[in-house]
Amino acid sequence: MGFSQAIRLNLASFSSPSPCDYCLTRVVNHKQKSLVAFPSITRRKRHLLLSVQSVLHNTRPNINDNGSAESANVLFDKLFARTHRLERQTNQHSVYPDDDDLPYSNLGVLESDLEAALVALLKREEDLHDAERKLLSDKNKLNRAKEELEKREKTISEASLKHESLQEELKRANVELASQAREIEELKHKLRERDEERAALQSSLTLKEEELEKMRQEIANRSKEVSMAISEFESKSQLLSKANEVVKRQEGEIYALQRALEEKEEELEISKATKKLEQEKLRETEANLKKQTEEWLIAQDEVNKLKEETVKRLGEANETMEDFMKVKKLLTDVRFELISSREALVFSREQMEEKELLLEKQLEELEEQRKSVLSYMQSLRDAHTEVESERVKLRVVEAKNFALEREISVQKELLEDLREELQKEKPLLELAMHDISVIQDELYKKANAFQVSQNLLQEKESSLVEAKLEIQHLKSEQASLELLLQEKDEELAEARNKLGEVNQEVTELKALMISREDQLMEATEMLKEKDVHLHRIEGELGSSKLKVTEAEMVVERIAELTNRLLMSTTNGQNQNAMRINNEISIDSMQQPLEKPHDDYGMENKRLVMELSFTRENLRMKEMEVLAVQRALTFKDEEINVVMGRLEAKEQELKKLKEETINDSEDLKVLYALAQERVGEKTMGDLAIEMLQLEAANLEVEAATSALQKLAKMSTELLTQADMSIEADTTHTVMPERGYSEGSNECLGEVKTEVVRLWSLTEKLLENAGIVAGTSTCMEGVIL
């Protein structure tokens, strides 16, 4: 009914004046207006069509008229397609106002389609009304049929009650007859059932005994597997120890190779320094030669000028020929000296090139050695990785062993459960045997009871023997655990002693550092004295400069006097002769005066260079002293931190010892409980063994972790000390001999102390039975 009302409402909406007609009249009257209102009208129409279509799709089709429903759906699909086309056309032609007649031609088609759809809807409504009427008539028919069926069921139930009463009476009679027969047969069946129960119990006992034997065999096999795994573990541990020994040997070889490389590098550095000095000397000699060649060229120019003047005045300069010959001899001597100096330069250059070739060869050899050392280091790392993989395998084997032990314990628990079940089933068997013996013979019952009691006594005796053996085994294990605890206590005492030795060595290192500080103070005092000496040298240089200036003034005055004398001469010949004599005398006077002037200039330059060099050395030494002081403070802080860590480790060791003592007391308590429960065969023995093994494993792991932490601390100390020493050595730049020797001695002592610390840590590790991969750390420290 609700469906028909919805359709009627939709039809009423269509019977009202349609928006399409309104739109058409408005467009005819107002063609000059725009089509702005048309999309809203089409949207309303689309909404109405969508509502109609939703109603049509939600309705149920008629039973007899499927074709009409399908035709209505097809019509509405066509309507929707045309409305979509209209919307598209309106959207396309809304921009162009000239094409107004296109959508209105389509609106007429839409109206015809709507009318056809309304006709189809009316037909559909009539069909639905017919279907509702048919459904009501069918319901009435069904109700009538139900009433008739209920009446028939009542009659059938009454007849069945009568039939059941008759059957019950017959059954009672049969039951009475059968009960009498059953009482007779039950007595026979009791004997048979007792016999069958006895056979079933015997078969179940045999099966359970077989299961017990199988479980025992499995336990024996598992114990064999555990022993095999333990033997494999021991063999792998031996292989690991051998591999560690080989690694240590290889580390020693690497250390020797590194020492050789360091020595060669030092030699190369020394040779480079000598090469630099020689190059500087060559440069100085070349500069001197250039100066001499320039002077020689100047002298040659002067000689040529003199020759020209002498050619003009041959008649007057016979006396001066001897002087010119002397000058020529001097020039030839200078020429020979220049040639010899050039040859020496060429020879020194050849020597330098040969030395450079030798140095290049040595560098190539060093690079090859470095490559070999690097390859060797890689092989060592590979060996370490293999060792670690073997350790992982060993841990896996240990885990498997632990799992096998757990399985064995579980199987033993199952065995005990089976034994308890057997003990529970034994009284049932005894009752069955007792009943059978009452039926058959009392003598047979007594004999069976006697055999059962004998079997029980034998089982109890065997259980007592096994309990005694287990108690002895537990006692032996307790003694071994006590010995292990004593050994651990001794190892802890040794570790404490070694820690005391380490502390003593740290104090010794502090004393060494204090002595090195004193040496640094002495070096600073020496540097101050050198500063005073340098100031003195500067004063002397100033006085020498004053003397040079005074000499230059004297030479200038002599030159002025000679010029005045030359101007006073009137005669030409006498003037020329006097000029020649004066020039010769002036040259002879200036030559000895110029030589000391040049010597003073060279000395001044040399002294200035020495002053600058000494100042730079002093600055570098001051920087080195500051760096050493910083390094000392940093090392003191590191030593304090390490001491704090060592104290923390001692506290951890004390805690571990207390825990081991508590574990031993717990083991003793468990052992006492096991002694009290000797008469019963329980899982307490295995629990005690497992607890003992776990306690021992915990002790070993705690000791190994503590020792590994100590080793890490020592390696960190060593690496930090070595890095600080390397930083100090890199900042130093060729100090004087005394100071360099003192610093080298200090470095040697520090390295010896570091090696001692490392040897102590290795001894600790060897005493604890740990084979850790600390060789790589030592390699980094030595490098």
From Swiss-Prot:
Keyword Chloroplast appears in the UniProt entry: yes
UniProt signal peptide: none
Transit peptide: 1-27
Domain of life: Eukaryota
UniProt KW keywords: Chloroplast, Coiled coil, Plastid, Starch biosynthesis, Transit peptide
A GO cellular component annotation in the UniProt record: chloroplast
Biotechnological applications listed in the UniProt record: May be a potential target for increasing starch granule size for indurstrial purposes. Modifying granule size in starch crops has an effect on both the ease of commercial starch preparation and on the final quality of various food and non-food products.
Subcellular location, principal: plastid
Disruption phenotype: Displays wild-type growth rate and unchanged starch amounts and distribution in leaves. Starch synthesis, starch degradation rates and starch ultrastructure as in wild-type leaves. No change in starch-metabolizing enzymes activity, including SS1, SS3, branching enzymes, debranching enzymes or phosphorylases. No change in expression of SS4, PTST2 and PTST3. No effect on SS4 localization within chloroplasts. Larger chloroplast starch granules than wild-type. However, in most chloroplasts only one large starch granule is present, in contrast to many in wild-type.
GO process terms (BP): regulation of starch biosynthetic process; starch biosynthetic process
Subcellular locations according to the entry: Plastid, Chloroplast
Keyword Chloroplast: yes
Coiled-coil regions listed: 128-309, 345-432, 457-512
Function: Required for the initiation of starch granules biosynthesis in leaf chloroplasts. Involved in determining starch granule number and size in chloroplasts.
Subunit structure: Interacts with PTST2; the interaction is essential for the initiation of starch granules biosynthesis in leaf chloroplasts. Interacts with SS4; the interaction is essential for the initiation of starch granules biosynthesis in leaf chloroplasts.
Protein name, per record: Protein involved in starch initiation 1
Protein species of origin: Arabidopsis thaliana
